């Protein structure tokens, strides 16, 4: 087996969210599926962050699954970021997470199992911080490490936040600065400073559970989680599904330090 200190990012051709199938390709496939639905269920048709299943007149269960390849080299940190990302979909719908299941792909013949332990402990650390249990999961052998979670949550039926219900003249609110994709690409190429890396890692492993605070301060009509398709991709998806257009002023966008300079270098 390889040394425990090996760089995890060298095992993936695309960093994390960049490995996602494109929205166009995904839509092409999903449009050909004739799925079963009833009045209590809502699935991928609206491209919301979670599926919804109404359990009574007051509440619904919401569920999401998310996993990706390493975007940082430290296994514990990778686990933290992957868990925070999985939980983010629940928060984007306005829900409360109840429990999680781990999803693991790991090259057991190439990497020490202690690395997998560290990844899982990273995910556990995030879940412990909000007092939700990890009740199980599923694992397979794979040449490329992958980790994420299936998260189940609950939400009041009259408080569900969807991504296709934006209204004209709505303001756009971001809970975090953007640019993590560019930073992680630069990290894989070892061309960013330790300060930039630490700042971005802190942002990525921070939970988006401030949504409830924002809801109490503003009337939120629609919400989504910005990940693999970036700000423009997700705003476009939200605007089109709401039959609107969006106007974004570059100077008003919170951006991680150093991202603009890296973008100018085609990173």
Which residue ranges define each predicted feature?
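Helix-biased detector of long, well-ordered alpha-helical tracts
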Residues: 1-267
């Amino acid at each position: 087996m390889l040394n425990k200190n090996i760089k995890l990012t060298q095992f993936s051709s695309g960093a994390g969210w960049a490995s996602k199938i494109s929205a166009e390709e995904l839509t092409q496939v999903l449009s050909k599926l004739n799925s079963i639905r009833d009045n209590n269920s809502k699935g991928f048709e609206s491209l919301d962050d979670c599926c919804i299943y109404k359990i009574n007149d007051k509440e619904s269960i919401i569920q999401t699954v998310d996993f990706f390849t390493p975007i940082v080299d430290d296994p514990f940190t990778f686990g933290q970021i992957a868990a925070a990302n999985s939980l983010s979909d629940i928060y984007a719908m306005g829900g409360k997470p109840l429990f999680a299941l781990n999803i693991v792909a790991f090259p057991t013949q190439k990497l020490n199992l202690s690395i997998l332990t560290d990844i899982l402990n990273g995910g556990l650390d995030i879940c412990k911080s909000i007092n939700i249990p990890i009740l199980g999961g599923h694992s397979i052998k794979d040449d490329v490490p992958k980790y994420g979670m299936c998260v189940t949550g609950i939400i009041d039926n009259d408080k569900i936040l969807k991504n296709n219900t934006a209204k004209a003249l709505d303001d756009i609110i971001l809970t975090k600065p953007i640019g993590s994709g560019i930073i992680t690409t630069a990290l894989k190429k070892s061309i960013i400073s330790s300060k930039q890396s630490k700042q971005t890692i802190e942002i990525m492993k921070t939970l988006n559970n401030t949504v409830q605070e924002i809801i109490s301060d503003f009337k939120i009509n629609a919400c989504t989680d910005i990940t693999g398709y970036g700000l423009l991709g997700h705003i476009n998806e939200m605007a089109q599904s709401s039959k609107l257009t969006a106007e974004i002023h570059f100077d008003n966008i919170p951006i991680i330090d150093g991202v603009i300079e890296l973008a100018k270098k085609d990173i």
